[in-house]
């Protein structure tokens, strides 16, 4: 038990330092190795903390976020909320709990969009949508199980890109975007239209990101 607590503490400290350094040095193994060096963590210990290095750091951060979101969501009476309001609330909590990652997210997205990481990215996006639907109490096990998660994955990715460009106070614009997007899923807005929104947001994000690099 004590060893687990020590390992968990080291993981958290290293992941936090990594996130701080990512905007400057990128989401990479080299960045993680440099962070470990700063904290006097040997490569052998690092391999125990994060066996797949920068990939496992990402999984660790996602798991942390999900734990916080679940705890916050279950801290109030959510049983009377409609399904769409449950989804909206959970998504808002996810972005609120990710606020400290905002500066690192452009590099994280570049990492996830590498050709060799695409399948992993799709899997993570599906798992994220699955987490949100399950926490909302979704019990579907038919075709709608996949269509719901597919649509929510599109919405989550679109919201992520929108959020990165959001300069509004307390991210109110992102919350409005979440509300309209989730209503779109529930009210049957076509997947084609959702994909067009995502494409437009992605083009806007990457054009801004490239401008900031020049």
Q: Which stretches of residues belong to each language-model region?
A:
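Short, Lys/Arg-enriched N-terminal segments with co-localized hydrophobic residues
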Residues: 1-6
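Short, amphipathic alpha-helix enriched in basic
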Residues: 8-43, 52-59, 63
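Conserved phosphoryl-transfer catalytic core
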Residues: 64-75
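Hydrophobic alpha-helical connector segments
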Residues: 73-107
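Amphipathic alpha-helical packing segments from all-alpha helical-bundle domains
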Residues: 116-138, 149-153, 157
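Hydrophobic/aromatic-rich alpha-helical bundle segments in the mid-to-C-terminal region
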Residues: 138-197
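Long, charge-rich low-complexity segments
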Residues: 191-214
């Amino acid at each position: 038990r004590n060893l687990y607590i020590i390992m968990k503490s080291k993981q958290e400290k290293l992941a936090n330092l990594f996130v701080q350094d990512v905007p400057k040095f990128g989401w990479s193994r080299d960045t993680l190795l440099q962070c470990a060096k700063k904290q006097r963590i040997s490569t052998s210990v690092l391999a125990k903390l994060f066996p797949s290095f920068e990939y496992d750091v990402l999984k660790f951060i996602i798991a942390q976020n999900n734990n916080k979101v679940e705890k916050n969501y279950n801290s109030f009476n959510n049983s009377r909320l409609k399904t769409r309001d449950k989804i909206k609330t959970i998504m808002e909590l996810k972005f609120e709990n990710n606020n400290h990652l905002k500066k690192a997210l452009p590099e994280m997205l570049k990492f996830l969009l590498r050709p060799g990481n695409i399948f992993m990215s799709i899997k993570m996006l599906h798992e994220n949508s699955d987490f949100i639907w399950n926490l909302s109490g979704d019990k579907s096990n038919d075709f709608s199980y996949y269509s719901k998660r597919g649509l929510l994955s599109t919405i989550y990715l679109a919201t992520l890109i929108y959020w990165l460009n959001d300069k509004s106070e307390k991210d109110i614009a992102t919350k409005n975007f979440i509300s309209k997007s989730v209503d779109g899923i529930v009210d049957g807005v076509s997947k084609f239209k959702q994909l067009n929104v995502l494409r437009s947001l992605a083009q806007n994000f990457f054009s801004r990101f490239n401008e900031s690099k020049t």
